[in-house]
Each structure stands twice: as C-alpha cells, then as structure tokens.
Amino acid sequence: MASSLFFRRFCCLHSATSPSSSSSSVFSKKKPLVFLGSPQVSTTVLDALFNASFAADAAFEVAAIVTQPPSRRDRGRKMMPSPVAQYALDKGFSSDLILTPEKAGEDKFLSTLKALQPELCITAAYGNILPTKFLNIPALGTVNIHPSLLPLYRGAAPVQRALQDGVKETGVSLAFTVRALDAGPVIAFEKFEVDEQIKAPDLLALLFLEGSKLLIRELPSILDGSAEKKAQPQDESKATKAPKIAPDEAWLSFDQEAYVLHNKVRAFAGWPGTRAKVVVADEKSGCHNILEFKIITTRVGIQETQADEICFVKDALLFPCGGRTALEVLEVQLPGKKVVSAGAFWNGMQGKRLKKFDETKHFSHVSV
C-alpha cells in the first residue's frame, strides 16, 4: 500500500541535513556498522543499509547483524530464524556474522561484538534491552529508529498505543540510544497525518519505510560526528509511555463509545486482535448462546442507537455502543475460520437474532 494513501507529509527533518565534509571526503576504509532488528518491518531498514553500503562511495559496511534467536512459528511450529535473519541469509549474508544472543548482555556476545570494533550500531525493533556494557562498545554510539514522535510513546507499542488514543498526527524519530528507554537525543524526525482507517501493521510498515529513508539521509552526519552535536535532548515533561499490549486487552466492551472501539480495532489489528461476545438467540428452539469472534475491520456509524439488538445495514453489522453511538463492523473472523465480510457472517446466522452480551447475565457458552 503506497504511503501516499494514508499520509500527508507536512514536516520533514528536525533540522535539514546540509552537505557535510564527510560526504565529499574520500574514506580510505569503510566503517563497520552493526545492525540490530528482528521482525519483518526491520528488513526494510536492513535493505536500505545493504543498498547504501554497496554504493561505490559508501562510507560504511554492514559488519554483522544481531537479531532474536530462532523460534517456533506458523502452524508447523518449526524452529525458524527471525525475519531479519532469514532476509539476510537470502541476500547471501554470512551466517557466521548473524548473531542471536538470548540477551544483549551475554559475555560471549559482547566479546564477539567488541572484536568487530563497530563504529556504529543501528537498531530497528530489535526486541531486547541494551545494557550499558553494550552501549559502550560502538565508537559513535547506537542510533535507534523509533516509530513515534519522541518523547511521545516511549516503549514497546508506540504505534498501537498512538492509534488506540486516536491521534491525528504521528511520525518516526531517529535518536541516540541511552540507558533510559527511548530517552536519547533526537537527531531527526518526520511527522505525518494519520488516516482514520489505517491499522497498526500498515502504519508500522510505513513508518519504518520512512525511518529507513531518514536514516540513510542522516548517516553521513552520524558517521562524521556532527549529528551528535545537532541532536536535541527530549523534553521530559512531554514524555508519554507506550506499554506492551496484554492479551486480555483484546476484549471489546460495547458500553464504550464507538470511536473508542474503532480506534482499538485499528490499534490491535494483527496481534492480539480484538474480540467480542454476542448473544445468539434462536427463536425456533428458544436457545440463547454466547458466540465469540474477532472483529477485524470497523468504522464509526453515523446513526445514533440505544437498542441492544445488533442488525445488518447495507454492508455492516451495526453494534449499539455507549453514548448513543454505533460501531459498523465490516469484517469478522470466527475461531479457526478465515476472515469474512459482515454480509457473509450475517447470512450464516440463518435468521437468528444477535444481541449485545451482558456480563451480568448467564448463558451457555459456544464458539461457532
């Protein structure tokens, strides 16, 4: 999905990058750089670094990659390398130079890193805390791509928490790493306006794409040391946190207003997703059961409603919500099934009535 579909860029760098002496000088030796990243979005940054390092006048080379150890993924539960490790291997990068410590403070790993004598480390969603012993190794420090406008949304889930809050503006920051979480001086940033329908996986991918461009643009100043001088300290009085998402946060409560639920669906898309319970009433048999499913895609309804009845209007399931608002649900997913449209789900109900689930009442539990 093209970034122009979701974003209107209206502010670029923290300070415009001017041609530095390093860009015109001739490097007798490429400076070793170590990249740290793990999920699929990190491969965008690694790809940008690979491409830049292959240029004839490149000032650096990717000397090693640090990533999470292999883990069991997908339905087969086979041990698989991280997406970053797999991407590097597919590009022909030496497996001996792909380091996978359980923790970044392991003595053996730190000894290996020291032997590489990196000038700079770059992190992009690595997933491990970097101890002081690590941060002291690279001569020029460690620089992180963080998908928020620091000091806003420091922590593990900046994109998700920003969408959950319904922000109209977000961005990506390039900052030096210090011991305190996401608190280092900011080298540069870019701001974007956020579309009201974009979901976390798409926003995350787009921010890391823009972050990779920002990194390549700023690398000359980082490598010649001028970035450290221009980097701006963060305003601690404006700092906010973006804590890791817990699985039990996935449940939706329709007592909340529709816009709150819509933002949560967008924020938790991918993982952990958003779940709901409804009462299925079969008038023929007189049975009332509880049905659980995931809500995949929504929009805020334009009509007010007070009823507890869930109905189907045009292309959406209409859920009554708090404050006389309504949430239009466009896609759902039943347990073990594929994502389906609201229309297909409604047809599958075969005339049964759907009502909001009330925790104060007791019904037998089913998952259809």
Predicted regions and their residues:
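Low-complexity, glycine/alanine/valine/leucine- and proline-rich hydrophobic stretches
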Residues: 296-336, 343-344
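One-carbon transfer enzymes
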Residues: 2-272, 325, 334-336, 344-368
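A short, local hydrophobic-aromatic micro-motif
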Residues: 61-63, 184, 291, 296, ...
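Residue-level detector of beta-strand structural context in well-folded domains
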Residues: 250-252, 274-276, 308, 315-317
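Residues in well-ordered beta-strands of folded domains
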Residues: 175, 253, 277, 294-296, ...
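Charge-rich, low-complexity intrinsically disordered and helical linker regions
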Residues: 85-89, 282, 313
